[in-house]
Swiss-Prot record:
Protein name per the record: DNA-directed RNA polymerase subunit beta'
Binding-site list for Zn(2+) 1: C70, C72, C85, C88
EC number(s) from the headed UniProt entry: 2.7.7.6
Cofactors demanded by this protein: Mg(2+); Zn(2+)
Species the sequence originates in: Shewanella baltica (strain OS185)
GO cellular component: DNA-directed RNA polymerase complex
Length: 1405
């Protein structure tokens, strides 16, 4: 018995650890792990199936094959535990030690570890400062390397071929030493004195000038320091002893028929042992050098294959022509250890089945088939049966359950009561893909799902399957109920809107109920209460849509929460009055007194949640659903072919369009328009025809004419089923109806270009063969796209989760005063996103004042909720500085104040909330809805870019942003600066519209002038770029010589002649160096200056500029001196959809990025080279000037002598995020990425809160580049974690030392994930080999800070409910590094262990 207790004690030891360190194993360490040397390649005896002695499965080394029994059978049973049999040498113990005991192989010759050799950058190569090519030649016995030069002219590490080696031998004899193979490399590595090398390199670093050399030395220094600090020795990168994996981890299983199934590793090990033994024999025999060398090379190759097959040369294949799976392959990739077994596991107590609708369920319920429940809850049922005394033993209970006795069902009901189960539908794209429900037992075999949670699961009932999981422990049940219950997940974590909004039938039913019909039965009746309306409807006195007067009672909840009732008479319909029955007390009847479309219902639920809280909303949502289903049934809405009414005008419209197309075709044939213009015009004609047809069709469908009570004709909204479905938002859209009853319109080819013959037919008329063929293009592309999209979107989500996984809320307030400036988003004349939506749920960073005063409206640290937002709107505040995670100062996490409101709960975020993962899911989940394509600008899209004026939509006053302007002779303003913007401000000072206006725009109104809606306030020529004069005077041509730098062209139509400047490439040699320009002279012939400066007014003319003036002409301020034709900017493909989002998060440089000014100053052009111009910026304060070479074909936005600000655009193009960060700062780059990502999602109608994108940006910005090291341990030019640098700086400042300075760096999400501090997390993401190699060399230790690392080591994650556990552990650890108390073994575990033991002891009697 004492033994038993000892046994139980030994079972409960859990290792307490705070980190995991990885390093290089020294040969002695490997020997210390080992339980014996494996000397023979034999595995098991094929007759007896017993392992061979000293072989790969040897029982003496690795442990017994059967529990508590030695190999020869002399000692059996527990009583001999720990005895080592003297006959066969096997220890009597459990067989599971064969999973943990390792062996080793003593290698006859050292072998390089391929990871440190071949995984780039090669660590051995960096260490020895030799090229990989050279080292490989030494290792694989192709050349010698000098180890000890002695007194010769050779130098250490010099390569010698066979011939040169022999020559050297003749010349020097044995003065020197040169070897080949791994021994040579081993000696070289052993000879390195780390401390000395490091000191030497640190001394020479400052004096190195060449950039590449400096980089190389820094790299080498970092590697050396990593070795030095970690205590690894460089020679350990060469193996002398090879560890052998425990045999149960590389099993060999006899199949029937005398064959064996085996792990590939056994083959690889056998190869190594064979070659090693042969090499030993050859060395004993003192065989010729060449044979030994060959054997050593083969040994090296076989060890390479064992460690990482296929890394060097061709992979070794097995009998089935497949490469063998090496140790490296075991851990990497989707099927590797990390992703297959550590990050995701299969679990028991789960089942799966098809789902069907459960329209009668409550929101927190799901229907569970009895069969499934019986299987899933078996242990609970056994326990209950035994506890009740219905069964005497577990065995008896088992029998009862198998027979399905009547009592079993009663017990099952009891067990299931209030025991939540979790339902999951794959793919689980966000956290709402697993929710908890209370099971309701049902007959049949399908799980029933509540219709309102379908949206969260993205489930439909066309054969979808779902999995059920049973939370077993009390804590698990508690979490399932409190956190995961479907009733607690009403709001979407992505945008804070309700996610349980009704859709489809329910919407249709509610919409139908709330419609009104003119002259319906019972119109004009008046009712004293809603109950009376119900009676009238039930008796048929009034129909559902009749317009009636009703006295309703509303409950009003005051600010303090007291309830008052008030009655009033409203004009409404019978249906709406019935809807008011389910309206919860406290909501106004006006919310349902309207046509209830999907949008309205969503708003109704949202209002309900904000005003009345969770419980009322859940009950109300259920009631809405039941009512919706009921009235949808009553409505009898159905679709017949006659519902698709084709408008009569369609045929005339199509005929007109065809006539126009013919006309253009004729113009084209007579050469008046080009092919491109013709194509664009044709597509335009058809696009507008399509619009007209669909407009006519919608008017036709949406209204019908009826006779009202007075016998007069009146129009009302139609009750056509198709129209109702689309209008309510239940199913279908205007675009789909257009295809049914209008015309299908233009189709695109698979490459995205538009086919110019449209499909004029619609589906009701039917398509002919050609039309059908054209439409198959689109349909197929759609299917292909969907397949690609899913994979791409999944990969994006994976990268996002990986980069953000360790971001958790860890404190209340970091105290920072920084934040992002939020303004309403305005594009052109539309407010795309009002300020309220952008700041709702955020915390104010700096006090917001009442407009025009110093009084504080919203003090710092106010959480802006709905009421506050109303207040801001009331005072027409149009910019607020709010806290953001990007500027949060918390180390290794964020604070609650910088994050603001938890969108899914509606209050400030809790500690321990895993905001990183939520952000990644919120951005990734709608990924499948985004498009995959790149838009080719063709036809309809390209004309948007050729705007030439600004027409305002609102009245107000005009305001200019960063615009320089001059006043021309007509008294109008002409803009002479780039990136100017023009805004319309209303009387309260709120910005209503904002437009970008180019250089050369003529404004019709002065600044601050009042404008009316519809006014055209600015004009410009979209096709040319003018050069505007800023002074008045006479012009003088410089360097403009006809036929050398310019030519004269005469316009055939007008007869006017103009001067065209030649490009440098078109000029003869004489004109190459000349620089054509226009100088402005005053009346006395002296140079004029540009106003306010000492710079003479001279304007350089670039190639292909057109000048319409003659020499010595007089001009005024604001006149155009010349025009540069804008090549209709080459139709660039706009990358849209998913690829665009991925590009932004990966921070990829665009192909031809915009060129931004690196410093502020004055522009001038230096000497040109072939194909490039030299742009020089000279700062005003006389500092160093900046030069950049720019290709000639880039269209520059700047002229000589112009002033630019740092970060201004010099040449147009897509802006690169890295440039924005460098030149305009962190907040600008954050705004840029947020807005660009939001643009893509907005196009698809997906709402995501900005916060989530900011969280990802924070993670992209977590590294920095050290610019000067100060007194820290960092190296200049090193990449370091910002938090680490900040912590180090704080300590230094406290001690009065010099802190390090750094520049923030923007990393793409893949790079950022791989650069994380935790090597476990990085290794499980991508490039496993590289990450592990790097970590091992540096002897890194993983502090298990993030979620992923903790999942991998099998702990609770430091977020959510696991946050408290980690907090107490860390506190205990900090208090005094005492061991944390481990839960002692519980009674039930002891019982279980005992049972196991008895089974073990009893099984071999």
């Amino acid at each position: 018995m004492k033994d038993l207790l000892k046994f139980l004690k030994q079972q409960s030891k859990t290792e307490e650890f705070n980190g995991i360190k990885i390093g290089l194993a020294s040969p002695d360490l490997i020997r210390s792990w080992s339980f014996g040397e494996v000397k023979k390649p034999e595995t098991i005896n094929y007759r007896t199936f017993k392992p061979e002695r000293e072989g790969l499965f040897c029982a003496r080394i690795f442990g017994p094959v059967k529990d508590y029994e030695c190999l020869c059978g002399k000692y059996k049973r527990l009583k001999h535990r720990g005895v080592i049999c003297e006959k066969c040498g096997v220890e009597v113990t459990q067989t599971k030690v064969r999973r943990e005991r390792m062996g080793h192989i003593e290698l006859a010759s050292p072998v390089a570890h391929i990871w440190f050799l071949k995984s780039l950058p090669s660590r051995i190569g960096l260490m020895l400062d030799m090229t990989l090519r050279d080292i490989e030649r030494v290792l694989y016995f192709e050349s010698f390397v000098v180890i000890e030069p002695g007194m010769t002219s050779l130098e250490r590490g010099q390569m010698l071929t066979e011939e040169t080696y022999l020559d050297a031998l003749e010349e020097y004899g044995d003065e020197f030493e040169a070897k080949m193979g791994a021994e040579a490399v081993l000696e070289l590595l052993r000879a390195i004195d780390l401390a000395k090398e490091i000191e030497q390199m640190r001394e020479e670093l400052p004096s190195i000038n060449s950039e590449t050399r400096r980089k190389k030395v820094t790299k080498r220094l970092k590697l050396m320091e990593a070795f030095y600090t970690s205590g690894n020795k460089p020679e350990w990168m060469i193996l002398k002893v090879l560890p052998v994996l425990p045999p149960d981890l590389r099993p060999l299983v006899p199949l029937d028929g005398g064959r064996f199934a085996t792990s590939d590793l056994n083959d690889l090990y056998r190869r190594v042992i064979n070659r090693n033994n042969r090499l030993k024999r050859l060395l004993d025999l003192a065989a010729p050098d060449i044979i030994v060398r060959n054997e050593k090379r083969m040994l090296q190759e076989s060890v390479d294959a064992l460690l990482d097959n296929g890394r060097r040369g061709r992979a070794i294949t097995g009998s089935n022509k497949r490469p063998l799976k090496s140790l490296a392959d075991m851990i990497k990739g989707k099927q590797g250890r990390f992703r297959q077994n550590l990050l995701g596991k299969r679990v028991d107590y789960s089942g799966r089945s098809v789902i069907t609708v459960g329209p009668t369920l409550r929101l927190h319920q799901c229907g569970l088939p009895k069969k499934m429940a019986l299987e899933l809850f078996k242990p609970f049922i056994y326990g209950k049966l035994e506890g009740r005394g219905l069964a005497t033993t577990i065995k008896a209970a088992k029998k009862m359950v198998e027979r399905e006795v009547a009592e079993v069902w009663d017990v099952l009901d009891e067990v299931i009561r209030e025991h939540p189960v979790m339902l999951n539908r794959a793919p689980t794209l966000h956290r709402l893909g697993i929710q908890a429900f209370e099971p309701v037992l049902i007959e049949g075999k399908a799980i029933q799902l509540h219709p309102l949670v379908c949206a969260a699961y993205n489930a439909d009932f066309d054969g979808d399957q779902m999995a059920v999981h049973v939370p077993l422990t009390l804590e698990a049940q508690l979490e399932a109920r409190a956190l995961m219950m479907s009733t607690n997940n009403i709001l979407s974590p992505a945008n804070g809107e309700p996610v349980i909004t009704p859709s489809q039938d329910v919407v249709l039913g509610l919409y139908y109920t709330s419609r009104e019909r003119i002259n319906g039965r019972g119109e004009g009746m008046a009712f004293m209460s809603v109950a009376e309306v119900e009676k009238a409807y039930a008796t048929g006195a009034a129909e559902l849509h009749a317009r009636v007067k009703v006295r309703i009672t509303e409950t009003i909840i005051g600010d303090t929460g007291e309830r008052t009732e008030q009655r009033r008479i409203v004009d409404t319909t019978v249906g709406r009055a019935l809807l008011s029955l389910i309206l919860p007390a406290g909501l106004s009847f006006d919310l349902v007194n309207q046509n209830m479309g999907k949008k309205q219902i969503s708003k109704l639920l949202n209002t309900c949640y904000r005003q009345l809280g969770l419980k009322d909303t859940v009950i109300f949502a259920d009631q809405l659903m039941y009512t919706g289903f009921r009235f949808a049934t009553i409505s009898g809405a159905s679709v017949g072919i006659d519902d698709m009414v084709i408008p009569d005008e369609k045929y005339t419209l199509v005929a007109d369009a065809e006539a126009e197309v013919l006309e253009i075709q004729e113009q084209f044939q007579s050469g008046l328009v080009t092919a491109g213009e013709r194509y664009n015009k044709v597509i335009d004609i058809w696009a507008s025809a399509n619009e007209k047809v669909s407009k006519a069709m919608m008017e036709n469908l949406s209204t019908e004419t009826v006779i009202n009570r007075d016998g007069v004709e009146e129009k009302q909204a139609s009750f056509n089923s198709i129209y109702m479905m689309a209008d309510s938002g239940a199913r279908g859209s205007a675009a789909q109806i257009r295809q049914l009853a209008g015309m299908r319109g233009l189709m695109a080819k698979p490459d995205g270009s538009i086919i110019e013959t449209p499909i004029t037919a619609n589906f009701r008329e039917g398509l002919n063969v050609l039309q059908y063929f054209i439409s198959t293009h689109g349909a197929r592309k759609g299917l292909a796209d969907t397949a690609l999209k899913t994979a791409n979107s999944g990969y994006l989500t994976r990268r996002l989760v990986d980069v953000a996984q360790d971001l958790v809320v860890i404190e209340d307030d970091c105290g920072t005063h920084e934040g992002l400036t939020m303004k309403p988003l305005i594009e052109g004349g539309d407010v795309v996103e009002p300020l309220r939506e952008r700041v709702l749920g955020r915390v104010v960073a700096l006090d917001v004042f009442y407009p025009g005063t110093e009084d504080v409206l919203a003090p710092r640290n106010t959480l802006l909720d709905e009421a506050w937002c109303d207040k801001l709107e009331e005072y027409s505040i149009d910019e607020v500085i709010v806290r953001s995670v990007i500027s949060c100062d918390t180390d290794f996490g964020v604070c609650a104040a910088c994050y603001g409101r938890d969108l899914a709960r509606g209050h400030i975020i809790n500690h321990g909330e895993a905001i990183g993962v939520v952000a990644a899911q919120s951005i990734g989940e709608p990924g499948t809805q985004l498009t995959m394509r790149t838009f080719h600008i063709g036809g309809a899209a390209s004309r948007a870019s050729a705007e030439n004026n600004v027409q305002v939509k609102n009245s107000g006053s005009l305001k200019l942003h960063n615009a320089k302007h001059v006043t021309n002779s007509d008294g109008k303003l002409v803009i002479v600066s780039r990136s100017s913007e023009l805004a319309v401000i209303d009387e309260l000072g709120r910005e209503k519209e904002r437009y970008k206006v180019p250089y050369g725009t003529v404004l019709e109104k002065l600044e601050e002038a009042a404008v009316e809606a519809g006014d055209v306030i600015a004009n410009w020529d979209p096709h040319t770029h003018p050069i505007i004069s800023e002074v008045a005077g006479s012009i003088k041509f410089v360097d403009m010589i006809d036929g050398v730098t310019m030519t004269r062209q005469t316009d055939e139509l007008t007869g006017l002649s103009s001067i065209v400047i030649l490009d440098v490439g078109q000029r003869g040699t004489a004109g190459k160096e000349m620089r054509p320009m226009i100088r402005l002279l005053g009346a006395n012939g002296a140079d004029l200056m540009i106003p306010g400066t000492e710079v003479p007014a001279q304007y350089f003319l670039p190639g292909s500029a057109i000048v319409n003036l003659e020499d010595n002409a007089q001009i005024n301020v604001g006149d155009a001196l010349a025009r540069i034709p804008q090549e209709s900017s080459k139709t660039r493909d706009i990358t849209g959809g998913l690829p665009r989002v991925a590009d932004l998060f990966e921070a990829r440089k665009p192909k031809e990025p915009a060129i931004l000014a690196e410093i502020s100053g004055t522009i001038s052009f230096g000497k040109e080279t072939k194909g490039k111009r030299r742009l020089v910026i000279t700062p005003a304060d006389g500092g160093d000037h900046y030069e950049e070479m720019i290709p000639k074909w880039r269209n520059l936005n700047v002229f000589e002598g112009e002033k630019v600000e740092r970060g201004e655009v010099i040449a147009d193009g897509p802006e690169a995020a890295h440039d924005i960060l460098r030149l305009r700062g962190i907040h600008n780059v954050a705004n840029y990425i947020v807005n660009e990502v939001q643009d893509v999602y907005r196009l698809q109608g997906v709402k995501i809160n900005d916060k989530h994108i900011e969280v990802i940006i924070r993670q992209m910005l977590r590294k920095c580049l050290i610019t000067s090291a100060g007194d820290t341990d960092f190296l200049e030019g090193e990449q370091a974690e910002v938090s680490r640098v900040k912590i180090a700086n704080r300590e230094l400042i406290a001690q009065g030392k010099v802190p390090a300075t750094f520049e923030r760096e923007l990393l793409g999400i893949t790079k950022a994930s791989l650069a994380t501090e935790s090597f476990i997390s990085a290794a499980s993401f991508q490039e496993t080999t590289r990450v592990l190699t790097e970590a091992a060399v540096g002897g890194k230790s993983d502090q298990l800070r993030g979620l992923k690392e903790n999942v991998i080591v099998g702990r609770l994650i430091p977020a959510g409910t696991g946050y408290a556990y980690h907090k107490t552990r860390n506190e205990a650890r900090a208090k005094k590094n005492e061991p944390v108390v481990v839960n002692k073994i519980t009674a039930s575990e002891a019982e279980q262990n005992l049972a196991d033991l008895l089974n073990l002891a009893g099984s071999q009697d």
